Amino acid sequence: MSAKLFRLDAGYQQYDWGKIGSSSAVAQYAANSDPSVQIEEDKPYAELWMGTHHKVPSRHHDTKVALSDLIAANPEGMLGSGNVEKFHSRKDLPFLFKVLSIEKVLSIQAHPDKNLGRRLHIQDPKNYPDDNHKPEMAIAISDFEGFCGFKPLEELAEELQRIPEFRSLVGEDIAAQFCAGIKVGAQEGSEEDKSNRKLLQSVFSNVMNASDDVIASHARHLVERAKQSPADFNNETLPALILRLNEQFPEDVGLFCGCLMLNHCVLKAGESIFLRAKDPHAYITGDIIECMAASDNVVRAGFTPKFKDVKNLVEMLTYSYDSVEDQKMKLLPFARSSGSGDSILYNPPIEEFAVLQTNFHGSTGTHHFDGLDGPSIVITTNGSGYIQSGDVRLKAEAGYVFFIAPHAEVDLQTEDSNFTTYRAFVEPN
């Protein structure tokens, strides 16, 4: 396969938390790109997977050959020699690109780093199917809500002081030690910061290790407080959030370890957060583009009927306590493109991927990209146009997915002013 540009077929997952029927961007993209997909209006459509992960592998649109097999036939040409050497694979992309459409809260979860991922995979391959880490970046394509990382410690201390059932669940002694012992403004890596993290770990550990009966009884009090005394909470959005998530997962530990302990993050379309390995998070509602290191490892904490690995979770977390604003991605102009519209770079502090958003903002014309030193996957999320490299010119509509080989110069040509694409890529340097 010598083509530098070709269309891919992407598979989808129908997890229970996905948006239902044609309200789901995943369903819309799947049906628009594949006429054989008939949307079932009573079924959830949760994730569209784009990449080489064996669970849902992407395939060449015309030949139906798996992308991983095409790469294996020409690793240097399809990945670039630098990426083959760096990521030690001759058939797989180092990233997994997704669209998520979220109706119900996902499990509060964290992902292991590389060392822990390898150890967990050896010890428990059923629950940890990969040996890799899984840092993630989420870019909102509609209004989005999620939990991202632990709240700043002073907010958590105020919550403990205001909410008796939270204090009781944590334990009065541990709660008092936390409120008296935290040092606000501690420099990262300092002894004060290390002490802060240990105090936070004690609070989280006590919540996560409480019995189901104890959690349920405390959750009933918390829900009643949210109904009857919303002013008791230090954030006016919390009571409604607690009531909403309690309807989805009644009396769940997530009401404490999520609603009370994690940042409630709200993003508008185009805004983005980066979620490091070993930081707790959960998506609540909305449609997002997600990119991650190629792994499917999850350590769950709450809002889930699935396996919860409390011991590993409590031990593995970083216990960082940054604000939402500190976790939002800084959007950068992309210097290696030109023409109509613009391209914004989302560049997280990891090696496996970066993402470009190209939007024509009501204009028409062509946007040109210089060749990149690695492979890319592109999805059209809105509007229509064409994608071209050399003599290959392909129609691009919402849900259409493409592979671009290293060093291929590419033009996006808009047919309407809403034409928007996202492009995940990796370069060795």
Swiss-Prot record:
Compartment(s): Cytoplasm
EC number annotated for this UniProt entry: 5.3.1.8
GO CC, one annotated term: cytosol
List of catalytic residues: 300
Catalytic activity: D-mannose 6-phosphate = D-fructose 6-phosphate
A Pfam family it matches: PMI_typeI_hel
First-listed, main subcellular location of the protein, grouped into a coarse class: cytoplasm
Disulfide bonds: none
Entry note: cofactor: Binds 1 zinc ion per subunit.
Keyword Nucleus included in the entry's annotation: no
Signal peptide extent: none
Biological process (GO), any one: cell wall mannoprotein biosynthetic process
Cofactor(s) it depends on: Zn(2+)
Taxonomic superkingdom: Eukaryota
Residues bound to Zn(2+): 109, 111, 136, 281
InterPro entries: Man6P_Isoase-1 (IPR001250), Mannose-6-P_Isomerase (IPR016305), Pmannose_isomerase-type1_CS (IPR018050), PMI_typeI_C (IPR046456), PMI_typeI_cat (IPR046457), PMI_typeI_hel (IPR046458), RmlC-like_jellyroll (IPR014710), RmlC_Cupin_sf (IPR011051)
UniProtKB keywords: Cytoplasm, Isomerase, Metal-binding, Zinc
Pathway assigned to this chain's UniProt record: Nucleotide-sugar biosynthesis; GDP-alpha-D-mannose biosynthesis; alpha-D-mannose 1-phosphate from D-fructose 6-phosphate: step 1/2
Molecular-function GO term, any one: zinc ion binding
Family note: Belongs to the mannose-6-phosphate isomerase type 1 family.
Function: Involved in the synthesis of the GDP-mannose and dolichol-phosphate-mannose required for a number of critical mannosyl transfer reactions.
Protein name: Mannose-6-phosphate isomerase
